[in-house]
Design a protein with these regions (language model features):
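Beta-propeller-forming repeat regions
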Residues: 1-326
């Protein structure tokens, strides 16, 4: 593939990325992981708004379905050692271009979240890295996954009237990764932690239970799911261990279990950015690491084997957004 890099702005510790429809136009959000702003860009890469100047600590953002310009975001998750005050906020623009930021729900240690739809109902699913913290690198308190039906109108929610969450699963140490996907026409999500890779599927109706299925028992920081080799079966692309250095792909064997079929030949310190999908007409697995050689790598199935291509070095991508002009 041929690549062209375009620097559109500067943002200290740029971290979170998300698409946003704003005033009917296709845009994207960029926010910082520390005490820095959030910016909104149009398709051309021109900065058109600053939804907030702080407080930062933004791990995830996602547009509220069917609401122009309105989106949810995490605030005040600054690191695994500084995220007790983390929460999910609602950010809403007005006609004059000002942005209102209100609390949707306090969620200590919330790192990732997503909005999934099934049978016309939207569900908020949130993933908390841990459940308690008393000193640096304290991992005694595993995280968990929580959910709620997301109402169509969020106007009544604020710090004093928060969305009620239900615990779906606990005991998830270093609950770091989240990846929304669609399997057999149903929106669902991969969630990864030291206990492995889990698939969460919303219920057919709010009165029913979520389906939770463990796909793999290998400790994982992040995962994606995609039919990389076009054999009709979904492979798992994995970053092994929390902020680990092993990049691998797992395939389904004849017994219906995932087994490793490929591993990148060198260690990549602090693997973090991860994405999978169709890029330039081919299924690709794109990843980046934040320390050491700080590569961005594309993996694809070519001539009966997995081949890799280095997109960039010495950059340290934190996350990846596949953004196509409409």
């Amino acid at each position: 593939m041929k690549y062209q890099k375009k620097v559109i702005s500067d943002l200290n510790l740029c971290y979170s990325l998300a698409e946003l429809t704003y005033k009917g136009k296709h845009c994207f959000l960029v926010a910082a992981e520390k005490h820095d702003p959030c910016y909104l860009f149009d398709e051309a890469g021109t900065k058109i708004a600053e939804p907030w100047a702080g407080p930062g600590g933004v791990m995830t953002m996602q547009q509220v379905p069917e609401h122009d310009g309105q989106f949810l975001a995490t605030h005040e998750f600054y690191s695994p050692n500084d995220s007790k005050n983390a929460r999910i906020i609602i950010c809403t623009p007005d006609e004059e271009g000002k942005w209102d930021v209100r609390t949707l729900v306090d969620a200590p240690f919330v790192h990732r979240f997503g909005i999934l739809k099934r049978n016309g109902i939207h569900y908020l699913i949130i993933c908390c890295l841990k459940s308690g913290h008393e000193y640096k690198d304290d991992w005694r308190f595993p995280g968990g996954v929580y959910a709620a039906v997301l109402p169509e109108n969020l106007d009544d929610f604020d710090e004093n009237n928060q969305l009620k969450l239900v615990k779906l699963k606990d005991g998830m140490l270093k609950n770091h990764g989240y990846c929304a996907t669609t399997i057999d026409g149903v929106e669902c999500a991969l969630v990864t932690c030291d206990e492995g890779v889990f698939l969460f599927t919303p219920p057919e109706s709010p009165a029913e239970q979520w389906e939770i299925k463990q796909l793999l028992d290998v400790p994982a920081s992040d995962a994606v799911i995609c039919d990389f080799d076009s054999d009709g079966k979904l492979e798992l692309g994995i970053i092994e261990k929390f902020h680990g250095d092993v990049l691998s792909i797992y395939r389904i064997n004849d017994h219906g279990k995932y087994e490793k079929c490929w591993e990148y030949p060198e260690k990549l310190e602090m693997l973090h950015a991860i994405w999978a999908g169709t890029l330039c007409g081919k299924k690709r697995f794109v990843v980046g690491n934040r320390r050491g050689n700080r590569k961005t790598i594309a993996v694809s199935w070519e001539a009966g084997e997995y081949q890799t291509e280095i997109i960039e070095e010495n950059t340290g991508a934190a996350n990846i957004l596949h953004f196509m002009n409409k």
